[in-house]
């Protein structure tokens, strides 16, 4: 795998992240009956570039009592993991065609918890640490349901390879037979990426900023990029799992166009939800998962395991 292949994946992702921040501000603006950014460049299109220049040219301050090494490593790890998770995603051909691509993505999303924990702990601030603890508890909790939903979907697909899901869904989207799972998956991805109405770690309208409260300039920008890269990546994964695109081996570019449209629609849904819903209380957030989602997903998983056996067939083998 050459460095060019790597760059052709990473650079478009970072560009998409930059313009997603602009899209979010524009969408929120119009939903609140105002314009949003419209000064820098035509229709405010150069706003992300201005933001990036401002953030990366500021002096990266840090608290005097912070742990320097960990304080700097946490945002780097966050962005590195967010970009690594794009590798096994089929668009329609992945950067690295892994045999266990789904497990790799689960492992990487679990590792992302460490960057949050390190940033809160290394800041040597009680507010950052409390924010980090809340973020970690939320992320780990919702990973349980994400893993069970993934297992149920993979039982229908018959393989841990993401590319197989495209072939599985050529005739019918998995959204149709597994719509309860798809709904729970979408809500869990909102919680996993710390987005409204589950953004209790940041709580922009009440708290300061959560685990990254002590960060400024470049390191803060890295956290910001990682968060938005994760949002787009989760929507891309949702599309692969439940909204399998039209795939014609003679014209693979059609798949990519189809894929991009679906990811954009899901991302707009994320922004729409942020503009529409108030924040959950922390106990409601945990009750939703442990008392509602977990029993439901376990029951659905048992259903998808027992159905093929009851119908005297076996799960598909690849």
Swiss-Prot record:
Keywords: Electron transport, Membrane, Mitochondrion, Mitochondrion inner membrane, NAD, Respiratory chain, Translocase, Transmembrane, Transmembrane helix, Transport, Ubiquinone. Its main location: mitochondrion. Coiled coil: none annotated. PROSITE patterns: COMPLEX1_ND1_1, COMPLEX1_ND1_2. The chain crosses the membrane at residues 3-23, 68-88, 100-120, 147-167, 172-192, 217-237, 253-273, 294-314. GO terms for biological process: mitochondrial electron transport, NADH to ubiquinone; mitochondrial respiratory chain complex I assembly. It catalyses: a ubiquinone + NADH + 5 H(+)(in) = a ubiquinol + NAD(+) + 4 H(+)(out). Its EC number is 7.1.1.2. It is a multi-pass membrane protein. One of its GO terms (molecular function) is NADH dehydrogenase (ubiquinone) activity. It is found in: Mitochondrion inner membrane. GO terms for cellular component: mitochondrial inner membrane. Core subunit of respiratory chain NADH dehydrogenase (Complex I) which is composed of 45 different subunits. Core subunit of the mitochondrial membrane respiratory chain NADH dehydrogenase (Complex I) which catalyzes electron transfer from NADH through the respiratory chain, using ubiquinone as an electron acceptor. Essential for the catalytic activity and assembly of complex I. Belongs to the complex I subunit 1 family. This is NADH-ubiquinone oxidoreductase chain 1.
């Amino acid at each position: 795998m050459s460095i060019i292949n790597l760059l052709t994946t990473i650079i478009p992702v970072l560009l998409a992240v930059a313009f997603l921040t602009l899209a979010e501000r524009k969408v929120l603006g119009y939903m609140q009956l105002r314009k949003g950014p419209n000064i820098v460049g035509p229709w405010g299109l150069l706003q992300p570039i201005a933001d990036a220049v401002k953030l990366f040219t500021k002096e990266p301050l840090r608290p005097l009592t912070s742990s320097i090494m960990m304080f700097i490593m946490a945002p780097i790890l966050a962005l590195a993991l967010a970009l690594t998770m794009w590798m096994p995603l089929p668009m329609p051909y992945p950067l690295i065609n892994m045999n266990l691509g789904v497990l790799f993505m689960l492992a990487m999303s679990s590792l992302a918890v460490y960057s949050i924990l390190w940033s809160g702990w290394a800041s040597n601030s009680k507010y950052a640490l409390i924010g980090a603890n809340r973020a970690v508890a939320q992320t780990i909790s919702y990973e349980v349901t994400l893993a069970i939903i993934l297992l149920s979907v993979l039982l229908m697909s018959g393989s841990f390879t993401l590319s197989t899901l495209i072939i599985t869904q050529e005739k019918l989207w998995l959204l149709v037979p597994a719509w309860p799972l798809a709904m729970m998956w979408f809500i869990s991805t909102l919680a996993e990426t710390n987005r409204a109405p589950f953004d209790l770690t940041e709580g922009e309208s009440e708290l300061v900023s959560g685990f990254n409260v002590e960060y400024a300039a470049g390191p803060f920008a890295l956290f910001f990029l990682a968060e938005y890269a994760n949002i787009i990546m989760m929507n891309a994964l949702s599309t692969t799992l439940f909204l399998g695109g039209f795939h014609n081996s003679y014209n693979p570019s059609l798949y990519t166009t189809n894929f991009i449209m679906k990811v954009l629609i899901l991302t707009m849904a994320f922004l729409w939800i942020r503009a529409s819903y108030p924040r959950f209380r922390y106990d409601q957030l945990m009750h939703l998962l442990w008392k509602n989602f977990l029993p439901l997903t376990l029951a659905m998983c048992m259903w998808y395991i027992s159905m093929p056996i009851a119908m005297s067939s076996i799960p598909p083998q690849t």
